[in-house]
Amino acid sequence: MPASNVLFLGAPSTGKTSLVKALAEHYREPWMHELGKDYWIKHQVERRLSQDQLLEIAELHLAAELSLLEQANRFLFTDTNAITTYVFALDYYGYVEEGLTQLAQSAEQRYDWIFLCDTDIPYEDTWERSGAVFRNRFQQMIIDDLNARGLKYVLLSGSLDRRIKTVRNFLDA
């Protein structure tokens, strides 16, 4: 039986990476890091990426994710995906080009679980983030996009320990 691909979405500074790392450690399984953040730090110009660069992020992320999924036994814990990149493109430009739209659509069927990390934790203000106001607006954009796609998700709130416990209750059921 193939490993389950477990996706974590949420605006910047909602605890995705901490949660994914903790779950990967607990289950001794691989995790897919947020490739887009690393790419943005390296390639952004005036805090923006081009549509072509956003497409490249989604393509690189997908290739790395599929490779890690082959290595997983039970679970791959995935920190964001093409849907997040799609929402960033929508936020930056007001539209999304066809290639990224297609990758976001293909992502709709790839995950066994989708968890949305809530904004109820303190905002960590680092140079690559756009502020707490942006976090709340972007979070709503993600929620709206998930709902428009008809994707079911579990909202994770509270402390890291509470979020871990909630996810484990679903995965171990």
PLM region descriptions:
Residues 2-5, 73:
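Pre-Walker A (Motif I) flank of P-loop NTPase domains
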Residues 25-62, 167:
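Conserved substrate/cofactor phosphate-moiety recognition/catalytic segment
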Residues 19:
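Hydrophobic positions on the alpha1 helix immediately C-terminal to the Walker A/P-loop
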